[in-house]
C-alpha cells in the first residue's frame, strides 16, 4: 500500500503542516507529527470529513456553467458609403459536469462537439469561493422567506374562506326557516272553505303573500351565494395549487443553488482530472464542395438545407448537434476552450461558396447584398432592425472637478460633445467644445442629461505637502514675537519704528507716506523683536490684512492730536479677525494740542478698553520725536509675548509667508518672506504659491548677505522662477520635481477657475450690458515696483468706475515698463501708469513714435486724482435750462403768406433770436417752440433787451392772443465730476 508523510501531503495540498494535522485530528485520524505516515484509507477518511463539513451533495450529478462575454467594435460602410461603428458582442460559455465516477466532463454547447481534452478546472481563490457561498446562502434565505410568506398567505386565505362559509351557512338557515313558515301558513289558508261570493281582500292574506314573496327571494339569494361560494372555493383551490407549484419551484431552485455551491467547493478542494477521449464514430466521406475556399472537414456529414427564410425551430440546435457529432472542427483545435454562442455561430459565406437559399439574408449583417431587388435588401434591414433589442440608457456617475471643459465632460458621460453643447444652449449658455465650465454649471448639466453628478475628490498633489510637513517632527523652541505696526496715515508709525531701529526710513519715502510693507528685526536688552510696518492709506487694505495675518501682536498707533480715524477702525477689525492682542501706542504726546484722554474714550467706543478701565489692552503714551515711552512700549510687547508662549520648531524645513514681492531688473524675481517655523538656508527648494525656485541668495533688511534664517526672521530671497503673489504661503520642499509639479498644478488650476468665472460673469451680464447701452471704457496698464503697490493701485482705480465710465485693467504687473507693454498699449489704446518705476530707452522711443501716453507716479494720491479727472471729462455733461427773458404780446397783426405777427414788449431779461420759448396763457404752458423771425421796426435783430418793443413770428404756430406771455430760455451743458 502506497503511503506518504504528513509533511509531503501538506506540501502537495499547498497547506501548512499544522492545518493538515488539525484537519486529520478532526477527521479521526490520529497523527501528531509531520513525519507520520499516511495511507490511502487515512486520505479517504479526510476526504469524507471535508465533504461532509463543506456540505457536498452525494452522488447526484453536478453541472457548472461559466459564461464569458466580450465586446468589440468594427467599422463598416453602409449603403450610402458612410463609415459606421458597429459594436459586436460575443458570448461564450463552458459547462462542467461532475459525474458519478468522479470524472469532470466539460460539456460545450449542443451545436458543438466535445473537445478531446478538458482543460484543468480554473483555480478560484478563497475570496471568490467565499463570495459564492455567501450568494448561495442569501439565495437560500430568500427562498425560505418566500416560503414563509406563501404559507402565511395560504393560512390567511383559509381563515377568510372559513369565515365566509360560516356566514353563508347562517344565511341559508335563516332563509330555510322563513320558507317553512311561509309554506305552513299557506297550507292553513287552503284548508278553510271558500265563500261563494268574493269578499273584500283580507289583510292576513296580503301579509301571507308578502311573506311568500320574501321567502322566494331569500331562496334565490341563497342559491346565488352558494354558487359564488363554490366559485370562490374553486379559485382558492387553484391559487393553493399555484402556491404549491411555486413553492416546489423555489425549493428546486434552492436545492440547485446549494448543490452548485457544493459542487464548486468540491471541485476547488479536489485536484483537476482529465476526461477520457470520447469513442470515435465511423468516419463518413463528405462529397467535395465546388467553389469554396475551405478544405472539407474529415468525417463531416452533409446537413439538410433549411427552407428559405424559415425561422429555426427550438429543437434545431440539438438536431444539428446530433447530425454533426462526428465532425472535426479545425477551428476548435486552434481556439481556446471558450465556446461561442451556438445561436450566433452560423456559416459566414465566402467568395464563391454555394450557400443555402436564404442563408445570407440573416448572417451577412455587415453590409447589404450586392445585386438583387432593392425591396429584398430593405426587407433584410427591416428584419435586422426588428430583431435589435432596445437599449436602456446607462446612468453614469460623473465625477466633476472644479473646472472641466465641454469635451472632457462629454467624454465622461459617453456622449458626443454636440449633445452637451445642445443641452447647454437649452439652459441659456453659448459654449464651444474647448470652453471650461465651472463645477456648479457642469453638475447641473449632468443631472439634466440623466446622469449622477458627484463632486470629484481633488487629485491635488498639494496633499503630499501636507504629509511631508506632518512627518517632520522637531522640538519646538521659544521664538521672537512678530509685531505689526498699524494705524491711520500720518499718525507716526514709520517714525516710531525709525526711533526704535535708530534709522531714518520715513524721510526717504515719497510724499512722507509708507506704500510698502517694511520688515525689520531689532535686538533689545530682553530679546529680539520682529517688526512689520504697514501702510496707513485706505488703498492698502490688502497689505494691512496680510500684516495682521502674519503677526503675533499688533501695535495700534493713534495720534494724540487726531484721535481715532477710519483706518484706525479698520486696523482694529483686522486685529480682531486675526485674533491677536493689541497694544495701543498714543503717539505725538509732545505736541501742545495732544489729548490722550479723548483717544482713550474714542477707542473704548471701538471696544478697545485700556487696562486701567478694566480691559485687556495696555495703553502707552509715546513720542517718536523725543523717544518718550519707547522703552515702556517694548516692555509691554515683550510681556505680551511671554504670556503667549510663542514656540516654533527650528531644526525643520522652513515654512512662512510672502510679505512682498517685486521684479528687479538685475536680480530677477525677489520676494520678502517671513520665516514662521523651521530654518531657511541658501540652496533650499522653495515653493511659494504657483512659483518655485532654489534660494540663490538671502539678504536681511540692511542688505547684508546671510546663510540661514530662523523663525520670526524676515529675509529677502532670490532665485524664484516668477514673482509670487504677496500673501502666499511658502515652504521648503525636499524634491525640486515635486515642487515643479505642485506649482504647475496650482497655476493651471488658478487659470481654469479664473476663465470659468470670467465666462460665467460674461454670460450673466450679457443682456444687462445690451440693455444699458454703450459704456465708455478707460483702458489702463499698471506697472509697479512691488506686488503690493500694484495690487493697491489697481483696487483704488477700479473703485472709480461708474455706470457710464468704467476702468478696464488691461494688464498689471511688477517691474520696469518694457517694449512689450508699449505694444500692448498700442493694440488696446491704453494709458500706461508707472508707479515707482520707469520705462527703458526702447520702450520710451516706441511710445513717442506711436503716441502712447506713459504717466509716472510716486504717490498713490496723485495717480487716483489724475485718473478721476480724466474720467470726469469722459462723462456726458448735464443739460441745464436757464430762463433769459420774458415778453408780453400787446398786439397781433395778420399778414397773408406769413401768419400772425406778435407785437411784444420785453418785460424782463433779453429776447434772443436763437433761444427757445414757451407760450404761457393764464400761467399755463400752451406751446413750446422757437422763433421764426425777430424784428425791431423793419430790421432783423439778434436780440432785444428789456424795456424795448419788437415784432416776432413763432415758427409753425399762429394761435396767439393778446395778453399771452412768451418765456425765453436756453439749454446749457454743465460738466460733471465723479
Curated annotation (Swiss-Prot):
- Cell compartment(s), UniProt: Cytoplasm
Ranges for region G5: 623-625
A GO MF annotation of the entry reads:
GTPase activity
Note whether Cytoplasm occurs among the keywords: yes
Paired cysteines (S-S)? none
G4: annotated span: 587-590
In what ranges is there compositional bias, type Low complexity? 170-186, 295-326, 349-361
Alphabetized, the UniProt keywords read: Cytoplasm, GTP-binding, Initiation factor, Nucleotide-binding, Protein biosynthesis
Q: What is its main location?
A: cytoplasm
Keyword Transmembrane listed? The answer is no
Q: Where does GTP bind?
A: 487-494, 533-537, 587-590
Q: Where is this region: G2?
A: 512-516
State the InterPro entries in the record: DNA-bd_dom_put_sf, EF-G-like_DII, IF2_assoc_dom_bac, IF2_II, IF2_N, P-loop_NTPase, Small_GTP-bd, T_Tr_GTP-bd_dom
* GO CC annotations on file: cytosol
For region G1, the annotated ranges are: 487-494
A single Pfam family it belongs to is IF-2
| Job of this protein | One of the essential components for the initiation of protein synthesis. Protects formylmethionyl-tRNA from spontaneous hydrolysis and promotes its binding to the 30S ribosomal subunits. Also involved in the hydrolysis of GTP during the formation of the 70S ribosomal complex.
- Family statement: Belongs to the TRAFAC class translation factor GTPase superfamily. Classic translation factor GTPase family. IF-2 subfamily.
Name-wise, this protein is Translation initiation factor IF-2
Amino acid at each position: 500500500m502506497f503511503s506518504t508523510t504528513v509533511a509531503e501531503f501538506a506540501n502537495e495540498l499547498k497547506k501548512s503542516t499544522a492545518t493538515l494535522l488539525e484537519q486529520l485530528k478532526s477527521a479521526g485520524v490520529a497523527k501528531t507529527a509531520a513525519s507520520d505516515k499516511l495511507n490511502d484509507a487515512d486520505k479517504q477518511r479526510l476526504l469524507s470529513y471535508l465533504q461532509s463539513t463543506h456540505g457536498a451533495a452525494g452522488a447526484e450529478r453536478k453541472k457548472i456553467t461559466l459564461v464569458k462575454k466580450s465586446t468589440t467594435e468594427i467599422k463598416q460602410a453602409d449603403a450610402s458609403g458612410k463609415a459606421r461603428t458597429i459594436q459586436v458582442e460575443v458570448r461564450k460559455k463552458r459547462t462542467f459536469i461532475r459525474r458519478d465516477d468522479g470524472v469532470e466532463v466539460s460539456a460545450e454547447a449542443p451545436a458543438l462537439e466535445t473537445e478531446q481534452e478538458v482543460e484543468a478546472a480554473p483555480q478560484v481563490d478563497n475570496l471568490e469561493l467565499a463570495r459564492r457561498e455567501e450568494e448561495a446562502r442569501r439565495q437560500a434565505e430568500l427562498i425560505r422567506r418566500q416560503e414563509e410568506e406563501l404559507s402565511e398567505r395560504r393560512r390567511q386565505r383559509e381563515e377568510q374562506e372559513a369565515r365566509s362559509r360560516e356566514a353563508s351557512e347562517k344565511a341559508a338557515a335563516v332563509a330555510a326557516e322563513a320558507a317553512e313558515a311561509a309554506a305552513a301558513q299557506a297550507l292553513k289558508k287552503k284548508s278553510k272553505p271558500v265563500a261563494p261570493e268574493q269578499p273584500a281582500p283580507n289583510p292576513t292574506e296580503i301579509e301571507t303573500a308578502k311573506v311568500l314573496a320574501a321567502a322566494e327571494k331569500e331562496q334565490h339569494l341563497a342559491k346565488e351565494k352558494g354558487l359564488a361560494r363554490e366559485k370562490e372555493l374553486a379559485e382558492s383551490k387553484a391559487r393553493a395549487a399555484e402556491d404549491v407549484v411555486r413553492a416546489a419551484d423555489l425549493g428546486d431552485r434552492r436545492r440547485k443553488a446549494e448543490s452548485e455551491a457544493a459542487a464548486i467547493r468540491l471541485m476547488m478542494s479536489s485536484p483537476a482530472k482529465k476526461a477520457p477521449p470520447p469513442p470515435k464514430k465511423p468516419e463518413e466521406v463528405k462529397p467535395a464542395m465546388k467553389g469554396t475556399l475551405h478544405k472539407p472537414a474529415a468525417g463531416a456529414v452533409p446537413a439538410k438545407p433549411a427552407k428559405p427564410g424559415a425561422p429555426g425551430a427550438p429543437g434545431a440546435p440539438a438536431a444539428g448537434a446530433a447530425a454533426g457529432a462526428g465532425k472535426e472542427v479545425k477551428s476548435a483545435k486552434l481556439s481556446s476552450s471558450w465556446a461561442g454562442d451556438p445561436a450566433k455561430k452560423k456559416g459566414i459565406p465566402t467568395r464563391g461558396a454555394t450557400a443555402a437559399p436564404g442563408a445570407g439574408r440573416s448572417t451577412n449583417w455587415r453590409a447589404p447584398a450586392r445585386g438583387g431587388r432593392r425591396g429584398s435588401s430593405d426587407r433584410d434591414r427591416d428584419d435586422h432592425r426588428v430583431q435589435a433589442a432596445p437599449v436602456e440608457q446607462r446612468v453614469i456617475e460623473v465625477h466633476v472637478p472644479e473646472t472641466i471643459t465641454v469635451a472632457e465632460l462629454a467624454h465622461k458621460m459617453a456622449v458626443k460633445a454636440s449633445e452637451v453643447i445642445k443641452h447647454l444652449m437649452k439652459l441659456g449658455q453659448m459654449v464651444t467644445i474647448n470652453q471650461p465650465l465651472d463645477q456648479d454649471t457642469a453638475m447641473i448639466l449632468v443631472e439634466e442629461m440623466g446622469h449622477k453628478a458627484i463632486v470629484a475628490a481633488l487629485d491635488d498633489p498639494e496633499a503630499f505637502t501636507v504629509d511631508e510637513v506632518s512627518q517632520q517632527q522637531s522640538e519646538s523652541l521659544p521664538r521672537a514675537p512678530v509685531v505689526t505696526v498699524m494705524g491711520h496715515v500720518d499718525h507716526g508709525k514709520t517714525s516710531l519704528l525709525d526711533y526704535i531701529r535708530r534709522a531714518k526710513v520715513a524721510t526717504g519715502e515719497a510724499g512722507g507716506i509708507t506704500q510698502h510693507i517694511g520688515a525689520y528685526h531689532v535686538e533689545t536688552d530682553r530679546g529680539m523683536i520682529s517688526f512689520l510696518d504697514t501702510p496707513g492709506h485706505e488703498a492698502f487694505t490688502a497689505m494691512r490684512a496680510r500684516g495682521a495675518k502674519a503677526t503675533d501682536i499688533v501695535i495700534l498707533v493713534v495720534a494724540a492730536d487726531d484721535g481715532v480715524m477710519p483706518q484706525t477702525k479698520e486696523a482694529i477689525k483686522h486685529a480682531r479677525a486675526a485674533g491677536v492682542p493689541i497694544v495701543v501706542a498714543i503717539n505725538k504726546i509732545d505736541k501742545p494740542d495732544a489729548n490722550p484722554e479723548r483717544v482713550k474714550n474714542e477707542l473704548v467706543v471701538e471696544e478697545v478698553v485700556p487696562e486701567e478701565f478694566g480691559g485687556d489692552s495696555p495703553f502707552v503714551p509715546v513720542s517718536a520725536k523725543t523717544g518718550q515711552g519707547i522703552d515702556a512700549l517694548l516692555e509691554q510687547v515683550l510681556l505680551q509675548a511671554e504670556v503667549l508662549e510663542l514656540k516654533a520648531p527650528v531644526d525643520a524645513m522652513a515654512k512662512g509667508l510672502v510679505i512682498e514681492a517685486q521684479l528687479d531688473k538685475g536680480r530677477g524675481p525677489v520676494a520678502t518672506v517671513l520665516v514662521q517655523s523651521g530654518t531657511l538656508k541658501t540652496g533650499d527648494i522653495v515653493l511659494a504659491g504657483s512659483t518655485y525656485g532654489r534660494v540663490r541668495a538671502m539678504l536681511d533688511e540692511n542688505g547684508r548677505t546671510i546663510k540661514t534664517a530662523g523663525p520670526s526672521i524676515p529675509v529677502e530671497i532670490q532665485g524664484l522662477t516668477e514673482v509670487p503673489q504677496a500673501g502666499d504661503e511658502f515652504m521648503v520642499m525636499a524634491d525640486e520635481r515635486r515642487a515643479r509639479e505642485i506649482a504647475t498644478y496650482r497655476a493651471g488650476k488658478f487659470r481654469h477657475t479664473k476663465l470659468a468665472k470670467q465666462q460665467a460673469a460674461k454670460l450673466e451680464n450679457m443682456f444687462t450690458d445690451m440693455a444699458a447701452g454703450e459704456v465708455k471704457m478707460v483702458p489702463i496698464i499698471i506697472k509697479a515696483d512691488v506686488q503690493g503697490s500694484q495690487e493697491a493701485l489697481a483696487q483704488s482705480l477700479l473703485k472709480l468706475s461708474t455706470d457710464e465710465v468704467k476702468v478696464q485693467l488691461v494688464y498689471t504687473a511688477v517691474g520696469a515698463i518694457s517694449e512689450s507693454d508699449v505694444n500692448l498699449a498700442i493694440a488696446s489704446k491704453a494709458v500706461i501708469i508707472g508707479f515707482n518705476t520707469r520705462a527703458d530707452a526702447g520702450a520710451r522711443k516706441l511710445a513717442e513714435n506711436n503716441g502712447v501716453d506713459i504717466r509716472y507716479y510716486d504717490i498713490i494720491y496723485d495717480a487716483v486724482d489724475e485718473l478721476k479727472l480724466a474720467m470726469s471729462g469722459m462723462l456726458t455733461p448735464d443739460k441745464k435750462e436757464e430762463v433769459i427773458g420774458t415778453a408780453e404780446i400787446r398786439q397781433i397783426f395778420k399778414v397773408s403768406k406769413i401768419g400772425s405777427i406778435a407785437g411784444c414788449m420785453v418785460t424782463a431779461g433779453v429776447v434772443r433770436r436763437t433761444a427757445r420759448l414757451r407760450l404761457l396763457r393764464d400761467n399755463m404752458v400752451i406751446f413750446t417752440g422757437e422763433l421764426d423771425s425777430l424784428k425791431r421796426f423793419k430790421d432783423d435783430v439778434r436780440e432785444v433787451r428789456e424795456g424795448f418793443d419788437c415784432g416776432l413770428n413763432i415758427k409753425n404756430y399762429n394761435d396767439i392772443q393778446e395778453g399771452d406771455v412768451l418765456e425765453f430760455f436756453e439749454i446749457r451743458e454743465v460738466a460733471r465730476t465723479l
